[in-house]
Swiss-Prot record:
Disulfide bonds: none annotated. GO terms for molecular function: structural molecule activity. Residues 1-19 form the signal peptide. One of its GO terms (cellular component) is outer membrane-bounded periplasmic space. One of its GO terms (biological process) is bacterial-type flagellum-dependent cell motility. It is found in: Periplasm; Bacterial flagellum basal body. Belongs to the FlgI family. Assembles around the rod to form the L-ring and probably protects the motor/basal body from shearing forces during rotation. It comes from the Bacteria. The keyword Signal applies. The basal body constitutes a major portion of the flagellar organelle and consists of four rings (L,P,S, and M) mounted on a central rod. It comes from Helicobacter acinonychis (strain Sheeba). Its main location: periplasm. This is Flagellar P-ring protein.
Length: 341
């Protein structure tokens, strides 16, 4: 039976201090995107639109025609060239009237395809019910395999701005993307050191309040804050996607010596040198006894990277690798957080 192996991607560091900028690890509270949504029609489809049985589509066509002084009952409309769609978009912070934003369109009826059609002018609303943008544009086929959704670059024009007055503010709040007591204090101390006064205070592991010095405007102040370097403490984390067989982990996460059994596989992890040279293979700086499923680090620490290479070498299935990782976590052999997707 063909074995299915996991791809191992090492992207997270093990308790290392990473050189980052404050702007990379924290966001300014209140300065964020706002989500927009709208309901509209895509016209000009070559018989691939919603069928006449889609009553909401036919009613929408009737309403659209009535807005241009053409009165016709929805029951009398027999068209397959129109599709009802939902439009979504993100309104960036500080966007101004006349700016363009991208939109995403998705069919909600029984259309076969919306490719090649034209989205007629559609208002986009926020959660407060107000219209913030108008969407309209042609849908090109591109390289998408999904015929029922599409993106239109610069497909909407902003008509209403979200007011946010930075100029008169004296204080703001930073929110860490990955809450951590140590990182919150490091951000606080770095800010106070750069400005040579107590302008920052960590309120909790995620939140740091900052006060603008009088000699700076708020825009100048935030520009300086975001560029300040910080030693960022990364978390130990292993992410397992069982469906795709992908594992994301730090290369330096240590696995303590242990014997773990899962299903029909037993793996022994040790620091002691292996004596049986017949079945021992070199695996980077480690040794692997394929006959007894024993992995030795030859006196050094064994990392999760080494364990993964050994498991693949002895032919453990994807399901078996996930089970062994879970067993290692449960036994305390690894101290990293584990997230199963």
């Amino acid at each position: 039976m063909k074995q299915v192996f996991l791809w191992l991607i090492f992207v997270l560091a093990f308790h290392k201090l990473l050189a980052e900028k404050i702007g990379d690890i924290a966001s300014v509270v209140g300065v964020r995107d706002n989500q927009l949504i709208g309901y509209g029609l895509v016209i000009g489809l070559n018989g691939t639109g919603d069928k006449s049985g889609s009553k909401f589509t036919m009613q929408s066509i009737s309403n659209m025609l009535e807005s241009v002084n053409v009165k016709i009952s929805a029951d009398d409309i027999k068209s397959k060239n129109v599709a009802a769609v939902m439009i979504t978009a993100s309104l960036p912070p500080f966007a101004r009237q006349g700016d363009k934003i991208d939109i995403h369109i998705s069919s909600i009826g029984d259309a076969k395809s919306i490719q090649g059609g034209t989205l007629v002018m559609t208002p986009l609303n926020a959660v407060d019910g107000n219209i913030y943008a108008l969407a309209q544009g042609s849908i090109t086929s591109g390289n998408s395999n999904n015929l029922l959704s599409a993106n239109i670059i610069n497909g909407a024009t902003i008509e209403r701005e979200v007011s946010y007055d930075l100029f008169h503010k004296n204080a703001m709040v930073l929110s860490l993307k990955n809450p951590n007591f140590k990182n919150a204090i490091q951000v606080q101390n770095a800010l106070n050191k750069v400005f040579n006064k107590r302008i920052a205070m960590a309120l909790d592991p995620k939140t740091i309040q900052i006060t603008r010095p009088e000699r700076f405007s708020m825009v100048e102040f935030l520009a300086i804050v975001q560029e300040i370097p910080i030693n960022y403490s990364a978390k130990n984390k292993i992410i397992v996607d069982e469906k795709s067989g992908t594992i994301v982990s730090g290369v330096d996460i240590i696995v303590h010596p242990i014997v773990v059994t899962s299903q029909d596989i037993t793996l022994k992890i040790t620091k002691e040198p292996l004596n049986d040279s017949k079945n021992v293979q070199d695996l980077d700086s480690m040794s692997l006894d394929t006959a007894h499923n024993t992995l030795s680090s030859n006196g050094k620490n064994i990392t999760i990277a080494g364990v993964m290479k050994a498991l693949q070498k002895i032919g453990v299935s994807a399901k078996g690798i996930v089970s062994i990782l879970q067993a290692l976590k449960k036994s305390g052999a690894i101290s990293a957080e584990m997230e199963i997707l």
